[in-house]
Amino acid sequence: MINNSNDIGFIQDIAGLDKLRQKAVNGDENAGQSALTAAARQFESIFTSMMLKSMRDANSDFKSDLMSSQNEDLYRQMLDEQMASEFSSSGSLGLADMIVAQLSTGQTASEQKGEDGFQEAMRRVEHARKTASERSNEDLVAAVYPLRKTQAVQSTQFDSRHSFVTKLKPYADKAARMLGVDSSLLIAQAALETGWGQKMVKNARGNSNNLFNIKADRSWQGDKVATQTLEYHNNVPVVEKAAFRSYASFDESFNDYVRFLENNPRYTNALDHGGNSERFIHGIHRAGYATDPQYADKVLRVKAQIDQMNLYKSPAGIFRRHSFSSSIFSAYQS
């Protein structure tokens, strides 16, 4: 099997394809062989993507107008393309091996061996098709919000939504007191951004602990990780590459979230209405925190789910806002 060190990454990474072309044209013999291997894997991923598309088209007549939408079709297409890339990256089908063997200088193969290899590849393709058809729609949502270049990291820290809430609650409570907002709202925002902790951005150590998907701008001096993300421009979803902040702990993530809001004047109006969850989340949304036109409503729906867990008994408005620099973290009755 070919070496998988040449990560083909995200299937729509055009810049990566251009680098591959330059390597093939300008590199030495070893670089050319490496480029051939990567190109073979790209071809395999395209073939697999076409196979998955044909499978989806065959089932299009069974779709329900009530349960389907254009956004769902877009997300499913993006998921299928990324699945095709991952199949090729792991060498699941074997087509790339055959291409490299046929095109590499000095390598020959008997016709019988080629025929056997083709039949084996077709068996692997059929297995991949069955695997893809069994993927649930829940995987689709988790794979694209947020969309990641790195393969999804299944967190071992949260084995359920209840676990996600209970483990983050102490950090959220502290941050909520500093901002003067509802603690469950912060957890809801983190749940939406990370798929309940199952889809956080991956760095060299594992999860980046970035619960709020705050990007690493020029002012950020800490660790960062590059990834693909789904942004909206004029209500149209677009895949972009961006750098995100990386933290050593969840506590750091919550603390930086507080600093991020308090140090940006555009969020001042939203912070002035922290006692009202709807006005606060809609306020930071309008100020540019997220580009998804439905972002605030999605956060509020997740918050309603968390509130039903009965983990929050404090009355509304129990917290007053404190500056991040303040060392007072006690709650005051309003």
Swiss-Prot record:
Q: Further notes on this entry?
A: Probably exported via the flagellum-specific export pathway.
Which intervals of the chain are annotated as region Catalytic?
Answer: 160-334
Group of enzyme by EC? hydrolase
What broad class describes the main subcellular location of this protein? periplasm
What are the record keywords, sorted?
Answer: Bacterial flagellum biogenesis, Cell wall biogenesis/degradation, Glycosidase, Hydrolase, Periplasm
Task: Kindly list the GO CC terms recorded for this protein.
Answer: periplasmic space
The name under which this protein is listed is Peptidoglycan hydrolase FlgJ
Query: What PANTHER family does UniProt report for this protein, alphabetically?
Result: PEPTIDOGLYCAN HYDROLASE FLGJ
Active site at which residues? Answer: 231, 256
Q: What is its EC number?
A: 3.2.1.-
Highest taxon in the source lineage: Bacteria
GO molecular function annotation: amidase activity; hydrolase activity, acting on glycosyl bonds
InterPro entries (alphabetical): Flagellar_prot_FlgJ_N (IPR019301), FlgJ (IPR013377), Glycosyl_Hydrolase_73 (IPR051056), MGlyc_endo_b_GlcNAc-like_dom (IPR002901)
Biological classification of the source: Bacteria, Pseudomonadati, Pseudomonadota, Gammaproteobacteria, Vibrionales
Query: Which species is this UniProt entry from?
Result: Vibrio cholerae serotype O1 (strain ATCC 39315 / El Tor Inaba N16961)
A GO biological-process term: cell wall organization
Gene symbol? flgJ
**Main role?**
Flagellum-specific muramidase which hydrolyzes the peptidoglycan layer to assemble the rod structure in the periplasmic space.
Coiled coil regions, renumbered to chain = none
